[in-house]
Amino acid sequence: LNKILLYLMLYVPSIRPLTKYLPEQLLLIGVSLYLFGALVGIYLVTQRWYMISRFLNRMSIFVMLIVTLILVNLIMYPRADALKTELRGSDQDDNLIIVGEGILRGESAYHLKTYLGNPISPGPGWALISLPFVAFHIYALFTPASLLLGGLIIKQYSGEYAKANLFLLFWMSSLIFWEISVVGSDMVA
């Protein structure tokens, strides 16, 4: 059941970016290959965990994965965020940024709307968690920092890097993760 849920949560939603970015003539083969590859990956991890865990149980892999997350977000987030000048893209990041900036000014920002005209939706608790990223203008690091924290907690409780690295790799193998991460969505965080 866990494998099925993992597959449904991480890989089936990844059909969306494939349909958005692949040319129509490659769509069927692209989606099929991606979903098949995800199934094979889950199968290998569950059936060959001992072998895979020996390889993954390294701090250097953990650091490499986190650095990759940080670099991709630092490079891609400004590009995705710039789409708002054309009234395109996602305003999910703006929700937290607007509330955070309101908190920093000592004001409520819940009467404001995003550039797409959507009402502000995150609660004040969630806005407080993201406040350091808003205050220091490093919002692109919100998702990588959240995954870093999740990975460190897994490492602490499991006592090994293999499970923390697997946690990161599962997220990073999902196309929908990358799409929502680089637009500043807080869904993963």
Task: State the predicted function of each range.
Residues 9-16, 123-131, 147-151, 171-176:
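Hydrophobic, membrane-inserted alpha-helices
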Residues 128, 139-163:
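Transmembrane-helix motifs of polytopic, lipid-linked glycan transferases
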